[in-house]
A protein has these predicted regions:
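P-loop NTPase motor module signature
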Residues: 1-187
Length: 187
């Protein structure tokens, strides 16, 4: 979330540095999972309220919450970096780590689908066709492949038909549609 605030502040500063350049200044807003629906900026994002006086076009800097949880009215452009910040469990470190990762092609469709709902729109992709073809998976990885499953394994061990036996727990976990990867089970 801090990155979207930095980007929006950077845009605001650039707009303020050139006060005579814009006849109507763009209004920069951040959108994340923490954005309160009752906040005025949320109503501006949805197009239910206009930006403050002296501002025109909305610039919405968002986390991946914008992929599906909100409908934007009159959105003309989406600029997609093809990245998201993801936390995943590293079984070697026994801790969650995070970093920027490529999104899946399905996420790209969701992001680009935010525009063109009420009028024509454009999706600008900040990656090459080669990157798209070689580095983007078709669908996001199931969470069971990246999350700490310790609590789930402990619950499974308490199931009557598993009886606290780790071998039975392994057998059950390996029957999942997507079983957890071996490093997650071996710890």
């Amino acid at each position: 979330n801090s990155e979207i605030f930095k980007v929006c502040n950077y845009i605001r500063q650039k707009i303020e540095d050139q006060p005579n350049y814009y006849s109507v200044k763009p209004y920069c807003i951040t959108l994340s999972g923490e954005t309160d629906e009752k906040h005025r900026d949320y109503k501006i994002i949805e197009g239910k309220e206009p930006p403050p006086k002296g501002y025109g076009r909305r610039i919405i800097i968002s986390t991946n919450v914008a992929e599906s949880s909100i409908t934007f009215t009159d959105l003309v452009y989406v600029i997609d970096t093809g990245l998201r910040y993801e936390k995943y469990y590293d079984p070697k470190k026994y801790a969650y780590v995070g970093g920027k990762v490529y999104i899946a092609r399905a996420n790209i469709e969701q992001r680009c689908g935010r525009t063109g709902r009420t009028n024509p729109g454009v999706c600008i992709k900040m990656y090459t066709k080669a990157q798209y073809e070689n580095q983007f998976q078709q669908y996001p990885s199931p969470e069971i492949e990246t999350a700490d499953i310790t609590d789930s394994v402990l619950r499974i061990l308490n199931l009557p038909f598993v009886g606290g036996n780790m071998i039975n727990a392994y057998k059950l976990l390996n029957q999942f549609i997507t079983p957890p990867s071996k490093p997650y089970l071996d710890r």
